[in-house]
């Protein structure tokens, strides 16, 4: 997710903004650096997963940048590459007491350079859409975080949909899940999934019909609540079966799921469980992305990596 302060990104092309402000040193970040940046994200209310960073770095360890003044972190951004055609931007942050000094835009430029000629996606707060457009991003859809203690929904009408929800390890493992995921995301991401499905505290389940994977989901502990993502399924009934099973693994504790408003069935699912809409983000891209099954997306993976 990106939630830059307006002073750091209010106009990406402001005359007089230095390319790199004096004393700012922008370098690639380490996992230890990212523990600090994740703390900033938590302060912004993003509720990052407790073990997210390791999976993020597994996809592209060179895609994380930190700006320092006298050795102290003051700014950050991630631009994670997926193959040759797609990248995703997140964690665009400047330390709250140092905003308005040009550190944000300098870090932004350093991060975007890592993407090369790839199409870049991001999830940014709607208030910053005009700023992102100035850097070539165009709106695709809005995503809303739904959160709360899940309530038991009314029973679904009609006969139960066929299928079984099982651990992903019993559903063909990484190979089967990566194949299904590739139809639901703008790029293939097996390195990320290998870590995400097996992350500390992560519970990953698949829905199988006649031996074929028809959806999968992951729930993981966050700083404030459990986080569900991704939640991908062929049908609303399948998504509901997966969501129920994921919730059961944490005793129906408070959860959050990031729901694309471009899929009305996903919104209906979150509302059926009594979850409350919170802040929204704008999914934006700098260019075309390969077609993917947006109707299968009932919860995105993360705001930070798409």
Predicted regions and their residues:
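A short helix-loop-beta-strand connector motif used in the catalytic cores of GNAT acetyltransferases and
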Residues: 49, 54-75, 86-88, 142, ...
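Conserved N-terminal entry element of GNAT/NAT acetyltransferase domains
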Residues: 2-31, 149-171
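Amide-forming acyltransferase catalytic core, primarily the GNAT-like/NAT-type
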Residues: 35, 137-227, 237
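Conserved acetyl-CoA-binding loop-helix of GNAT-fold acetyltransferases
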Residues: 94, 100-113, 236-248, 268
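Conserved GNAT acetyl-CoA-binding A-motif
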Residues: 114-126, 251-261, 281
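Conserved beta-strand in the GNAT
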Residues: 66, 72-80, 87-93, 206, ...
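Conserved active-site tyrosine of GNAT-family acetyltransferases
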Residues: 131-137, 270
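Conserved catalytic-core motifs of GNAT/GCN5-like acyltransferases
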Residues: 81, 119-123, 138-152, 277-289
């Amino acid at each position: 997710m990106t939630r830059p302060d307006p002073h750091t990104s209010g106009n990406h092309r402001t005359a007089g903004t230095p390319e790199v402000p004096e004393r700012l040193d922008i370098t690639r970040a380490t996992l230890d650096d990212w523990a600090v940046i994740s703390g900033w994200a938590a302060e912004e209310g993003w509720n990052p997963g407790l073990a997210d960073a390791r999976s993020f770095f597994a996809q592209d360890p060179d895609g994380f940048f930190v700006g320092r003044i006298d050795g102290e972190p003051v700014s950050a951004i991630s631009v994670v590459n997926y193959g040759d055609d797609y990248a995703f931007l997140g964690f665009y942050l400047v330390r709250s007491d140092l905003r308005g000094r040009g550190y944000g835009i300098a870090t932004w430029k350093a991060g975007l350079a890592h993407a090369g000629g790839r199409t870049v996606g991001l999830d940014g707060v709607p208030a910053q859409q005009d700023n992102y457009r100035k850097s070539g991003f165009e709106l695709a859809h809005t995503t809303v975080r739904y959160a709360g203690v899940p309530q038991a929904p009314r029973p679904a009408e009609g006969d139960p949909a066929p299928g079984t929800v099982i651990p992903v390890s019993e559903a063909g493992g990484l190979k089967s899940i990566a194949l299904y995921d590739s139809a639901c995301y703008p790029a293939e991401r097996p390195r990320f999934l290998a870590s995400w499905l097996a992350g500390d505290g992560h519970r990953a389940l698949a829905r199988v019909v006649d031996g074929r994977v028809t959806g999968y989901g992951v729930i993981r502990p966050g700083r404030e609540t459990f986080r569900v993502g991704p939640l991908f399924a062929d049908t609303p009934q399948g998504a509901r079966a997966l969501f129920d099973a994921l919730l059961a693994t944490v005793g129906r504790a408070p959860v959050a799921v990031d729901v694309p408003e471009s899929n009305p069935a996903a919104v209906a699912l979150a509302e059926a469980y009594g979850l409350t809409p919170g802040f929204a983000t704008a999914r934006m891209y700098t260019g075309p992305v390969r077609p993917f099954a947006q109707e299968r997306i009932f919860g995105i993976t993360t705001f930070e990596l798409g």
